[in-house]
Amino acid sequence: MNSKIIEAFFIVALFTTSCLAQAPAPSPTTTVTPPPVATPPPAATPAPTTTPPPAVSPAPTSSPPSSAPSPSSDAPTASPPAPEGPGVSPGELAPTPSDASAPPPNAALTNKAFVVGSLVAAIIYAVVLA
């Protein structure tokens, strides 16, 4: 009788191992990461200008004035990007807080079902082999 119980235990152990190996794995939990925020580039600092020494002789007035732009007017300024319009933005593809508040699927019930099924099978094997 003792060997039959051990034999039933091994059969049930093999059955349980088979059932648990085929059990669906719990779904991985996803963490919601905020979308990356683009930081504006630092503002360009104007280059220090040196004052030219005073001219000894006046410049001729017949030459046209130089049309070189001043460095302060062409200095790039940091500005936020313009809105793209009614197109789909990356923010719309991200999950909303209502999606994040949904509870994750419970895989414990699935594993409990396999454990209960294994116990029922163990009882049946014990009754049949006894």
Swiss-Prot record:
InterPro entries, alphabetized: AGP (IPR044959)
Post-translational note: O-glycosylated on hydroxyprolines; noncontiguous hydroxylproline residues are glycosylated with arabinogalactan.
Localization per record: Cell membrane
Propeptide: 107-130
GPI-anchor amidated asparagine lipid attachment residues: N106
Keyword Transmembrane helix: no
Annotated positions of the 4-hydroxyproline modification: P24, P26, P28, P35, P36
Record-level GO cellular component terms: plasma membrane; side of membrane
Residues making up the signal peptide according to the UniProt record: 1-21
Biased amino acid composition, Pro residues: 33-68
Positions carrying Pyrrolidone carboxylic acid: Q22
Residues annotated as glycosylated: P24, P26, P28, P35, P36
Membrane topology (UniProt): Lipid-anchor; GPI-anchor
Entry keyword set: Cell membrane, Glycoprotein, GPI-anchor, Hydroxylation, Lipoprotein, Membrane, Proteoglycan, Pyrrolidone carboxylic acid, Signal
UniProt-annotated stretches for the region Disordered: 22-108
Similarity comment text for this entry: Belongs to the classical AGP family.
Function, as annotated: Proteoglycan that seems to be implicated in diverse developmental roles such as differentiation, cell-cell recognition, embryogenesis and programmed cell death.
Protein name per its UniProtKB record: Classical arabinogalactan protein 7
Organism placement in taxonomy: Eukaryota, Viridiplantae, Streptophyta, Embryophyta, Tracheophyta
Gene: AGP7
